[in-house]
Amino acid sequence: MSVDMNSQGSDSNEEDYDPNCEEEEEEEEDPGDIEDYYVGVASDVEQQGADAFDPEEYQFTCLTYKESEGALHEHMTSLASVLKVSHSVAKLILVNFHWQVSEILDRYRSNSAQLLVEARVQPNPSKHVPTAHPPHHCAVCMQFVRKENLLSLACQHQFCRSCWEQHCSVLVKDGVGVGISCMAQDCPLRTPEDFVFPLLPNEELRDKYRRYLFRDYVESHFQLQLCPGADCPMVIRVQEPRARRVQCNRCSEVFCFKCRQMYHAPTDCATIRKWLTKCADDSETANYISAHTKDCPKCNICIEKNGGCNHMQCSKCKHDFCWMCLGDWKTHGSEYYECSRYKENPDIVNQSQQAQAREALKKYLFYFERWENHNKSLQLEAQTYERIHEKIQERVMNNLGTWIDWQYLQNAAKLLAKCRYTLQYTYPYAYYMESGPRKKLFEYQQAQLEAEIENLSWKVERADSYDRGDLENQMHIAEQRRRTLLKDFHDT
């Protein structure tokens, strides 16, 4: 939260929010079980302790390159021994079936020949087309070569060593690992690594090939993910692959295990991809909403937002208002935190295509503006965190307490960032959500979370005006709101 460039804020009006307050224009709905749930949510926040169930709890392990390689090697040697195949072929089979050994063994017992066909290490007898070229003839360079210089996979499509070398070298230079396949048209067979390595002309290419193979092995493994951090060699291992938050213990990168993108709960992986693509396509929208200034709705003075809190106070007239909707903050909380909920036009389906297009744009802008606003608030609150850190250092240096005495201030700023990050990703979720009782429940929880986050942000930015107990109580409420929303809606 902030005001004009020279202003400081004062205490907020922190009123309780009435979940049953609805706009008069909206149709009256039978609340049914939802109203009971609203009451339950409010009581849950007060009853749950700090050790309450965390819906984001997720067990994972960070592995080094050597540890990952060792785990992969163990799977490979075990499978090769059971199936009586080479280590290279065993790896191709494992890649094709995402390293799920039990499934591979079941398929092998059921139909071993079909397993090898599906893994692309043996040709399909019903579809295999043998070479039509004369003996000792390379089908690529069209040259006659000595028999010992002709090489082929299990498909028996023969090509000269020189053509194989060029084929493999070009693909490795292009970043291909496991994906190197037979040169014959429409032949799906993949080349085992023990076939490729002797064909690479120098150690530099062989080193690249090893890296690409390792990358492909990890990416195909259902329990492993490469850390997306810059130049980070770590691998994350889990027991159950899900769209959950993981953090590398080497570079501290935080990401979604399932899609390796920025963590995005409660929005699922497919939805966040759609949303980010849409935002990128509508780049002009970002320019339209990029302004950091708005006019005070009471005295019209230009106000700059240089803090994360959306509770604004004009330095000139002391009017308290919401940055997002410009509504009076005194009544803001009593109106179901309305500015977080989009009011759709129920008659839009009966209107013209142009009207529907305008409504679609209006809806998108509503959600995008809030998404972008919370992103900016996170950046501004990161600066607040640094100021708190510096202030604590100054107090400790002046013998005004120890780090332990003031640690709660940093904890509050960290929790604020955690809660606001979750809130930011509720907007893509709501944008794509179908209208109905479940969306109304989601919007209620979203509004409750947003209200408590703004209360926490206000207090963090004015920590000297609040005692420790008040701040920690607000932290507890905000975190429980966040956990309640994720428990009910982060189900991927």
UniProtKB/Swiss-Prot annotation:
Zn(2+) 1 binds at C138, C141, C160, C163. It comes from the Eukaryota. GO terms for biological process: developmental cell growth; hematopoietic stem cell proliferation; proteasome-mediated ubiquitin-dependent protein catabolic process; protein K48-linked ubiquitination; protein K63-linked ubiquitination; protein polyubiquitination; protein ubiquitination; ubiquitin-dependent protein catabolic process. The lineage of its organism: Eukaryota, Metazoa, Chordata, Craniata, Vertebrata. Interacts (via RING-type zinc finger 1) with UBE2L3. Interacts (via RING-type zinc finger 2) with UBE2N. Interacts with neddylated CUL5. Interacts (via RING-type 2) with GFI1B. Interacts with GFI1; prevents its ubiquitination and proteasomal degradation. Interacts with DCUN1D1 (via UBA-like domain); promotes DCUN1D1 ubiquitination. Autoinhibited by the ariadne domain, which masks the second RING-type zinc finger that contains the active site and inhibits the E3 activity. Inhibition is relieved upon binding to neddylated cullin-RING ubiquitin ligase complexes, which activate the E3 ligase activity of ARIH1. Residues 358-492 are annotated as: Ariadne domain. It holds the Pfam family Ariadne. GO terms for molecular function: ubiquitin conjugating enzyme binding; ubiquitin protein ligase activity; ubiquitin-protein transferase activity; zinc ion binding. Its EC number is 2.3.2.31. Residues 1-37 are annotated as: Disordered. Keywords: Cytoplasm, Metal-binding, Nucleus, Phosphoprotein, Repeat, Transferase, Ubl conjugation, Ubl conjugation pathway, Zinc, Zinc-finger. Zn(2+) 6 binds at C322, C325, H332, C339. GO terms for cellular component: Cul5-RING ubiquitin ligase complex; cytoplasm; nucleoplasm; nucleus. Zn(2+) 5 binds at C296, C299, C314, C317. A zinc finger (RING-type) spans 138-187, 296-325. Disulfide bonds: none annotated. This is E3 ubiquitin-protein ligase ARIH2. The keyword Oxidoreductase does not apply. Zn(2+) 2 binds at C155, H157, C182, C187. Residues 64-111 are annotated as: UBA-like. A zinc finger (IBR-type) spans 207-269. Its main location: nucleus.
